[in-house]
Each structure stands twice: as structure tokens, then as C-alpha cells.
Amino acid sequence: MNFKYSILFICFGTLDRGLIPECPFNEYDILFFVYTRQQRDGIVLTEETLQNYDLFKKSTISRQVVFIDHGFLSNGNNENFIAMAKALIEKDNFLVISVDWKKGACNAFASTLDYLGYSTAVGNTRHVGKYVADFTKLLVEQYKVSMSNIRLIGHSLGAHTSGFAGKEVQELKLNKYSNIDGLDPAGPSFDSNDCPERLCETDAEYVQIIHTSNILGVYSKIGTVDFYMNYGSHQPGCGRFFSPSCSHTKAVKYLTECIKHECCLIGTPWKKYFSTPKPISQCTKDTCVCVGLNAKSYPARGSFYVPVEATAPYCHNEGIKL
């Protein structure tokens, strides 16, 4: 049995199947919350708001559209994703769409039993990915938004949902998304899967992975660049004791701080298990990469170790620039 499931099995393995939530939902349960500089608190995207707010009028279709996709037991109005959305619109006037599929992610009830709905939530990721892809097609064909201007950011299960959206748009004969940022992609039910069954580096032109928990997240290299924050395991500031959920969530906070601040979280080349990372002081723009929205502009590819501090903005390299 996979270690990541063993505790749940020990505690709940003998429960009647009828007690395990199935987290059913359909496409009508998926909401899009839109954030712009004019709608800083977010509005629910509907046909009416599309027309009334003219979100994709000709004068704005050239700007970047960013989808944010939450994970298990979460929702599109989670404070961490709101903070990220607001950082994005302040940074560069992005149009941000937070995807809310909370029913399918088992967030409908605050119950311990919700954790047992994980396998159903895993299956729902494909449906959400297809829904995002279908909406992407609408943006491209009806509103003339370029695929090169669309970015997906997903945390945990949301990272794989983004990957499935990336696969689906290619099936729809669209170009690839410009970027997918996988924030500690969920490990259980995915870490031994091949590319068709998880987020993969071929799902977008550039796939950035931020690893923060080797318990709840995938630990293997799956992106164009894979950043292992504090070696991709226990994160500073998450307490002395075992706290995988805190480390898992740190991936969202790291990217948000990279968006908000000029300080660069520098990744230095690292061959997992086989080498000690080189000191950041030896980095050049050709060998190392800054975590964040502009990672694609650096030529280096592969796996990178990133030292981080316990508190925001988490930079461990004050005064060092690439």
C-alpha cells in the first residue's frame, strides 16, 4: 500500500462505503471568479457579466489571462488564491480567472470524512480540465485571445487539472498554453503515473513546477523546470513537527511573493540524491533560474534547488541578482 494512504486506511479502512463522500458535481457547479483592476474584489463570470463588463473587448485582448486552479478541499475564494489574484492584477494588469470547483474537490462540508472523498476528487480533475479547455476555446475563437497570452496556475489537484486542460486544448486543435505553473502538484494517485495521467512538461510551452512537500506532492521531475524549495520537503516556518499540509500550501505563498516582490528566489542546478547544490554565489543568468512568472526567460532547464527563509518574502539571497 502507498505510504501516503496508509494512515487514512488504518483510521477509516473499515468504514461502510456509504459513509464515504462521493463529491458529485457537474459543469454547472463550476464558477469562474474574475479579477481585474476594475473588479478587485472579484465578480462571478456569467454571460451577463461578459457582456456588461466587456472583459474581452478589443482594446484588452492582448493582455495576459491567468487561470488559478485550487486543489482538494479548497475553493476559488480561498484567501491564498485571492492574494495571488490581487498580486497579479497589481503587477501587470492581468485578467485573472479563479476556477471554483469546490463541490468536486469535496469542499462542500467541513467534515473529517471529506478526506475520504479524495479518489473521487482525483477523477473530477479531468472534468474540470475539460471545462477550462472549452472556455479557453471560446476565448480564442469568439474573443480572439491568443493562446500565447493564456497562463494556468494550479495548486495540488489543481496542477493536474491544469495539465488536463493543456492536453485537451491540443485535442481541440488549439496551440499550447504559454505557461503552466504547477504548485506542488498532488502526489497521491499521481506520482507513479505517466504523462497522459498527470501534469506533464508537454502540456504547455513551458511548465514550471514548485515542489514543497514530498509527502503530499509529486517529488519526481515532471516539468520544463522543477524547483525544489528547501529540497522539496519540509518548509521553513512550518513548525518543528511533521506538517505536510503547511509545506504543501507554501508553494502558493512562494509564487505570490515572487509576483509581489523584486527579490528573486534563485534556483541553482541540482541532481537529486547525487550532488550538493552549487552555492548561489556561483550562479549566472545562463546556469540558474529565478522562480516566478519570468522563469521562461532564463535558458537553463532541469531540476533546481532553492533555499528559502521562513517568512515572507522568503528570499535567501539579498543583494544577489541574475
From Swiss-Prot:
Cellular compartments annotated: Secreted
Record GO terms (molecular function): phospholipase A1 activity
EC number: 3.1.1.32
One annotated GO biological process: killing of cells of another organism
Coiled coil: none
Root EC class: hydrolase
Residue intervals passing through the bilayer: none
Disulfide bonds: 23-106, 195-200, 238-246, 263-290, 264-315, 283-288
Keywords: Allergen, Cytolysis, Disulfide bond, Hemolysis, Hydrolase, Lipid degradation, Lipid metabolism, Secreted, Signal
Post-translational modification: Contains six disulfide bonds. Is not glycosylated.
Catalytic residues of the enzyme: 156 (nucleophile), 184 (charge relay system), 248 (charge relay system)
Family the UniProt entry places it in: Belongs to the AB hydrolase superfamily. Lipase family.
Name of this protein: Phospholipase A1
Organism per entry: Polybia paulista (Neotropical social wasp)
